[in-house]
């Protein structure tokens, strides 16, 4: 039995990322031993990379009212379709920039098999801050970090990730609310020893940490694609400008999404109260 599988989370509107993603994947991780699942909504990847299963997570499902499933619903359905307990989470705009240390990924996946109490191991320098050593090469992470449950490249125990999902949440709301749910549930996330790697130096999985921001290309992607002979019509999306304010329609949509997360907010209040009661009880003993 394989020790882990790989989930590349995406949506059909990001189809333009799939070919460059897997072209760089084949170049920088040609001997990847794990099965790769692409979490599409309805579409099927038809590129040259053969070891890719398009999940088409929304196909055949009734999605009333909205017409589209939420990010969390799609991720839940994908995780339920996978066959391993440990999942390497990636996204379609995490474009590889150098060779992957597949041996390190395998070692940490094996550690998760050996220690079923580990819910998550962050593998990137963009992960959560380290606190203290726990296992060889692994540190505990800071549960007070706002993005404790972040969506960067990580090994997840499938059931742990499923337990943090709430169907109404987007990726950004999951990172915000899911981080607090993980803290209040006393999940102890781990991160690789920060002294071993950095953004500029060694990385287990070297990649651009987000190739698309608010639907637009992140500038360094153009240089990466040019260097590898990857053609892309960048004018379709345009490039992200941090000085550009989102249009009024986008702000209205965001406000509507915030309103839809009222259940998450109520749940967190209850979890926080219980967490603080337990903390006070422990402090009084």
Predicted regions and their residues:
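Membrane-proximal basic amphipathic "stem/tether" segments
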Residues: 1, 227-285
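Conserved donor-nucleotide/metal-binding helix-loop-beta segment in metal-dependent transferases, i.e.
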Residues: 98-129
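Active-site-proximal specificity loops/subdomain of glycosyltransferases
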Residues: 37-86
């Amino acid at each position: 039995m394989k020790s882990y599988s790989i989930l590349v989370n995406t949506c059909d509107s990001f189809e333009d990322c799939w070919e460059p993603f897997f072209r760089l994947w084949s170049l920088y991780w040609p001997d990847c031993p794990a099965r790769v699942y692409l979490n599409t909504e309805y579409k099927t990847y038809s590129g040259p990379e053969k070891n890719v299963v398009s999940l088409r997570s929304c196909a055949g499902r009734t999605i009333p009212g909205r017409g589209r499933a939420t990010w969390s619903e799609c991720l839940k359905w994908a995780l339920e379709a996978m066959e391993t307990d440990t999942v390497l989470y990636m996204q379609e705009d995490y474009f590889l920039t150098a060779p992957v240390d597949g041996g390190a990924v395998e070692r940490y996946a094996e550690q998760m098999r050996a220690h079923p109490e580990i819910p998550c191991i962050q593998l990137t320098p963009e992960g959560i801050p380290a606190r203290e050593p726990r296992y060889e090469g692994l540190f505990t992470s800071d549960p007070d970090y706002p993005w404790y449950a972040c969506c960067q490249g990580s090994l997840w125990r499938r059931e742990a990730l499923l337990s943090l999902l709430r169907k109404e949440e987007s990726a950004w709301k999951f990172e915000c609310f899911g981080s607090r749910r993980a803290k209040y549930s006393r999940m102890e996330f781990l991160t690789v020893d920060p002294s071993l790697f950095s953004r500029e130096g060694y990385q287990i999985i070297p990649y651009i940490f987000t190739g698309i921001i608010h639907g637009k290309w992140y500038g360094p992607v153009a240089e990466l694609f040019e260097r590898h002979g990857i053609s892309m019509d960048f004018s379709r999306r345009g490039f992200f400008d941090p000085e550009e304010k989102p249009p009024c329609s986008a702000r209205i949509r965001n406000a509507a999404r915030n309103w839809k997360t009222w259940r998450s907010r109520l749940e967190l209040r209850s979890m926080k109260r219980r967490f603080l009661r337990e903390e006070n009880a422990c402090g009084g003993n």
